[in-house]
Swiss-Prot record:
Predominant subcellular localization, coarse grouping: cytoplasm
Active site annotation, chain numbering: C116, H252, N282
One of the record's GO molecular function terms: 3-oxoacyl-[acyl-carrier-protein] synthase activity
UniProt organism field: Xanthomonas oryzae pv. oryzae (strain MAFF 311018)
UniProt subunit comment: Homodimer.
Pathway(s) the chain acts in: Lipid metabolism; fatty acid biosynthesis
UniProt free text on domains: The last Arg residue of the ACP-binding site is essential for the weak association between ACP/AcpP and FabH.
Keywords for the protein's UniProt record, in alphabetical order: Acyltransferase, Cytoplasm, Fatty acid biosynthesis, Fatty acid metabolism, Lipid biosynthesis, Lipid metabolism, Multifunctional enzyme, Transferase
Name of the featured protein: Beta-ketoacyl-[acyl-carrier-protein] synthase III
Region (ACP-binding): 253-257
Amino acid sequence: MSKRIYSRIAGTGSYLPEKVLTNDDMSKIVDTSDEWIFSRTGIRERHIAADDQATSDLAYFASLKAMEAAGVTADEIDLIVIGTTTPDLIFPSTACLLQARLGNVGCGAMDVNAACSGFVYALSVADKFVRSGDAKTVLVVGAETLTRILDWTDRTTCVLFGDGAGAVILKADEETGILSTHLRADGSKKELLWDPVGVSVGFGEGKNGGGALLMKGNDVFKYAVKALNSVVDETLAANGYDAHDLDWLIPHQANLRIIEATAKRLDLPMEQVVVTVDRHGNTSSASVPLALDEAVRSGRVQRGQLLLLEAFGGGFAWGSALLRY
C-alpha cells in the first residue's frame, strides 16, 4: 500500500510596498478619523503600491523570499498558482508573468480569482496537484493591488484595504503537511461585495473602466461570521480535531471584529490568533500568507504545530485549510 503524500509548506515569504498610509493620512482624503476607523475595523495603517508597481511585482518579491526560505530555485518549481482579483492584465495570467520573471521555463501557471479567499483557494488547488503526484514543488501566491479598484471618495470602503503579497512553497512530503482544505461559495450574494464591471458586461467611464469595489459592510459581517464558523467546524471535524487542538488560527485580515468573533466561537485566546490587520489593512488574497509569513519569521509558528487558515471574500467565496506546519 502506497504512503499518503502530503503537501508541506517548505518556506514562506511576503512583500509590502514602501508607502504607508495611516488613518490620520486617510482623514485628509475623506471625512474620517483614526478613532472612527480603528474602533470599527482595528486598522491603523495600510501599504499602498507605487504607481509603477503591478500585482506581479509584489508577487515576485514575496516569491523570492519564499523560495529562499525553502531552498528552492526557479527551475525546481513544477507549478505556479496565484490567488488574485487584481491581475496585471486581462491575459496572460499574472502567474505566467511571474513565471517569466522568475526565469522558469515550462511549468504550469494559473491564476485563481476568489477575491479575499484567493490564497486559500490557490492553496487547495496546489495541494491537489501535489497529493495526486502531478507536482512535487509548487509556488502558491496571494497578491493584490486592491487600492487600484477603490473609490477614494467612499469612506466606508477606501479606509479598509491595502496592497501586498504573500507566498509559500509547497513540497511533497510523506510525513506531514496540509491535512485538508474546504472551499465554499454563494454566488447569490454577489451584490453585497463586488466590483460590477468587466470584459463581458462592459466598462463604464473613468479610471479602471469605472470599476470600484462596492460593499454592504454590515451584511457582509453577519454572513462572514456564520460562514466561517461553519467551515471551521467542518474542517476540524473532518480531521478528528477540536478547536483546543489548534496551536494557531491564521485568519483573513479583513476586520478585527470578525477575527475576534471567530476566535471567541472557537474558545481560542487571542494570543493564539495571528493578527496583522492593524498594520496591513485588508490585503484581500494576500492577507493570509502575509500573516503566516510574519508569524513564521517572528518565531511564533514552529514546526509541528497545528494551524488553521481561513478566509472569506466576495462571491461570496470562503474556505479553510488545516495543516501541520
